[in-house]
Every structure is written in C-alpha cells, then in structure tokens.
Amino acid sequence: GIPCGESCIFIPCITTVVGCSCSNKVCYDN
C-alpha cells in the first residue's frame, strides 16, 4: 500500500527486489 516512487506502465518494477509490486501502473510496497 505504500508507493515506491516508481511506475510500471512500460517496464516492470525494479523495486521488486526490495519487496515492491506493480498495482494500477504504480509500484507499491503493501
């Protein structure tokens, strides 16, 4: 639920390595 400051419209979230995931074209951490 916390935005990770990264979008995932064109490329996947790089922040997945720190627990973030793509949701509604924005990377979130829980």
UniProtKB/Swiss-Prot annotation:
Tissue: Detected in seeds (at protein level).
Pfam families: Cyclotide (PF03784)
Record has Disulfide bond as a keyword: yes
SUPFAM superfamilies, alphabetized: Cyclotides (SSF57038)
Covalent cross-link (Cyclopeptide (Gly-Asn)), residues: 1-30
Entry's family note: Belongs to the cyclotide family.
Protein's recorded name: Cyclotide hyen-K
